[in-house]
Amino acid sequence: MYLKRILITLSLITLPIVPCLSYAAESISNVGINNTGSTANLAPAAADANVSASDKHEESWWQRSKNNLSTTWNAPQSHDIYIPTITWHNRWTYDKEKTDRYNEKPWGAGYGVSRLDKDGDWHGLYIMAFKDSYNKWEPIGGYGYEKRWRPTSDQDFQLGLGFTAGFTMRDNWNYIPIPVLLPLASISYSKLSFQATYIPGTYNNGNVFFAWFRWQI
């Protein structure tokens, strides 16, 4: 019940922002949802396809951000399951006595929606909860973006680099919502992605590698 309450609290903080942005997409025609088995075949959102080069040039960064959030929320191409996999505390920045007692198995799960835009880049909204360094539940939710590269002839194999922005809540901070802006990287093949971030910090604080699997359903 405690975990359920904090997840509900986090969703109330992060998710209502997105529907408020939906007005940005009201003039856009309905976007079909393509749920094909391969990420290489995911059809880019019609909203993106209808934006001319001149319109895109005139569009502000803030407006583009709102449009991306709104389109991802209203017209996702896939629904995703998140499985936290590893947290690793950088041994160069921690005393051994601390890392010896920290938890590095972030048991948990999450859910999200995502899409590829007309350039083949990834946009996602997600919420997940996992066991933190002190083995306490930590929820996190937000928006993720990755520029995608397809270095081989197999278009299902993709590399990604971008960022995630959202909110998290921790037991040792009394579950006060804390904004986060972190780097994001991934290796993907078809429906499966291995995504990771690095939380910077100071000595004995932060400097944590956190990774998870994302599976399109």
From Swiss-Prot:
The keyword Electron transport does not apply. Gene3D superfamilies: 2.40.160.20. It is found in: Cell outer membrane. Its EC number is 2.3.1.251. The keyword Membrane applies. Its main location: membrane. It catalyses: a lipid A + a 1,2-diacyl-sn-glycero-3-phosphocholine = a hepta-acyl lipid A + a 2-acyl-sn-glycero-3-phosphocholine; a lipid IVA + a 1,2-diacyl-sn-glycero-3-phosphocholine = a lipid IVB + a 2-acyl-sn-glycero-3-phosphocholine; a lipid IIA + a 1,2-diacyl-sn-glycero-3-phosphocholine = a lipid IIB + a 2-acyl-sn-glycero-3-phosphocholine. The record marks 98 as: Role in lipopolysaccharide recognition. InterPro entries: LipidA_acyl_PagP (IPR009746), OMP/PagP_b-brl (IPR011250). GO terms for cellular component: cell outer membrane. Homodimer. This is Lipid A acyltransferase PagP. It comes from Pectobacterium atrosepticum (strain SCRI 1043 / ATCC BAA-672) (Erwinia carotovora subsp. atroseptica). The gene is pagP.
